[in-house]
Amino acid sequence: MTHYFDKPQKSTYLGFGERPVILVVDLMKGGSMNGLPGRAVRNTRILIQEARKKNVPIGYTVLAYRSDLKDYPPNKLASMKLVMGTESVKVMDEVAPGPEDFVIIKKTNSPFIGTNLLLLLTLMQADTIIVTGRHTSGCIRATAADAFSYGYRTIVPEECVGDGKGILPHKANLCDLHIRGADVLTLREVLEYLGKL
């Protein structure tokens, strides 16, 4: 965390639990990819490969709407044409889900709103949510904030997230998330944790 804080306090870290779940947020073929670092996708792939070796559950979220957009909520962004059943809402090939993974279709920034994600996490007895994907200032922030609010230890590996709006909102939101509930860690720290499971 030295790249966010001059003097990081270990007391500000909540740490990992014992039953993690990886959430890959909105790494879809369609939608706005402007400025999303390729490293976020590559590093998410590394993370999920290691998670599978340890049988850690992996979930994916995708934004997808009806073709008439009647389920598209009020939004400041123009419609991204993310229509259910089209190629644009499929997860990117580099990080595609396996048969053992689960996929959540959502309508808002947070996958906890209007979905069965909370039920799935409860059934898996999860206590730690590791959040990866796009966009740090939108869906990543909303996902991490809600995960923390529901009582989960929330981890954001910095190298596994990116923001289409640029590096400033990316870093500002990571800093704020770390202060307000999530642990923003390095990919190496998360991989070391998985290795001990």
Predicted regions: what they are:
Residues 35-52:
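…and closely analogous acidic/polar surface helices at protein-protein or active-site interfaces
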Residues 23-25:
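Short hydrophobic beta-strand that contains or immediately precedes a catalytic carboxylate
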Residues 30, 66-68, 162-163:
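Active-site loop signature of alpha/beta-hydrolase-fold enzymes
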Residues 1-21, 49-54, 80-197:
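Active-site-adjacent betaalpha module
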Residues 51-70:
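Von Willebrand factor
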Residues 67-84:
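Acidic/polar short surface loop at catalytic or gating sites that assists cofactor/ion binding
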Residues 28-35:
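Short acidic, Gly/Ser-rich segments with clustered Asp/Glu that frequently serve as metal-coordination loops
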Residues 27, 63-65, 159:
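Active-site loop/turn elements of alpha/beta-hydrolase fold enzymes
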